[in-house]
Amino acid sequence: MAKGHRSKIKRERNEVRDTRPSAKLSYARVSVQKACFVLDAIRGKSVNEALAIVTYNPRYASSLVKKLLESAIANAENNYPEKNYKAENLYVAECFANKGPTMKRIHPRAQGRAYRIEKRMSHITIVLDER
């Protein structure tokens, strides 16, 4: 049933909203499993250390994560002037990849057969916090 006026519901929802700086990349053309290899390497690390890790990581997902991490740092510095975040004090509080849609493709095989190829996508999120 009704839980109150719309403005009251919005006010309550905004009170519990996560206010940590973050960045999200939707529909990244990398599978969740491959993205998690890179994300597991930077989880809990300081921002400068995480940038160094993804810069020299040879995986394809690391270039996507590097751009996303730089975006999260810029979001922290520009979108939260009252908190006055500095890059040297930030660390990767949360980072995860959720499953996105899958593109189905056909690969022709011998004797008129066709195999299905699934090109997987993911939604990658990085949340920073201050130490």
UniProtKB/Swiss-Prot annotation:
Any GO molecular function: rRNA binding
Keyword annotations from UniProtKB, A to Z: Ribonucleoprotein, Ribosomal protein, RNA-binding, rRNA-binding
InterPro entries, A to Z: Ribosomal_uL22 (IPR001063), Ribosomal_uL22_bac/chlpt-type (IPR005727), Ribosomal_uL22_bac/org-type (IPR047867), Ribosomal_uL22_CS (IPR018260), Ribosomal_uL22_sf (IPR036394)
GO BP term, example: translation
Matches recorded under PROSITE patterns: RIBOSOMAL_L22
Chain residue ranges for the region called Disordered: 1-20
Domain of life, per lineage: Bacteria
Compositional bias ranges of the Basic residues kind: 1-11
GO CC aspect terms: cytosolic large ribosomal subunit
Family statement: Belongs to the universal ribosomal protein uL22 family.
Record's subunit section: Part of the 50S ribosomal subunit.
HAMAP family listed in its UniProt record: Ribosomal_uL22_B
NCBIfam families: rplV_bact
Function comment: This protein binds specifically to 23S rRNA; its binding is stimulated by other ribosomal proteins, e.g. L4, L17, and L20. It is important during the early stages of 50S assembly. It makes multiple contacts with different domains of the 23S rRNA in the assembled 50S subunit and ribosome. The globular domain of the protein is located near the polypeptide exit tunnel on the outside of the subunit, while an extended beta-hairpin is found that lines the wall of the exit tunnel in the center of the 70S ribosome.
Protein known as: Large ribosomal subunit protein uL22
Organism: Agathobacter rectalis (strain ATCC 33656 / DSM 3377 / JCM 17463 / KCTC 5835 / VPI 0990) (Eubacterium rectale)
